Amino acid sequence: MLQSCIIQNSKQENCEQIEIIIREINEGGIKDIVFSNADGGVFYINRGLERGLTLQGMKNKVLNKKVTLHLAKIITGTSSNHIAQISLGEEVIYTEFN
């Protein structure tokens, strides 16, 4: 059962792409950066604070703006809330893609 929650592959073709307006940014989990939208959706960059990102930097960049998220899929093919890439227009803010 636990294996079905594992993110298998953070490649662009294995992600769901959505657009949201970021309404809130906080720290959660273990150094995760957590983004919320107006509809109650919650998405996160796993250990984002260990990857050179800061809460204030993300707030300055994307708070109250429309961004594109690439959400990694778990082994079953269902989309997770794990952000594999976040973009603002043409600018990639963070990516796990090579």
Segments the model singles out, each with a brief description of its role:
Residues 8-31:
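Structural detector for short beta-strands of small beta-barrel domains
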Residues 52-69:
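Short nucleic-acid-contacting surface segments enriched for D/E, G, S/T with interspersed K/R
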Residues 29-49:
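OB-fold (S1/OB) nucleic-acid-binding surfaces
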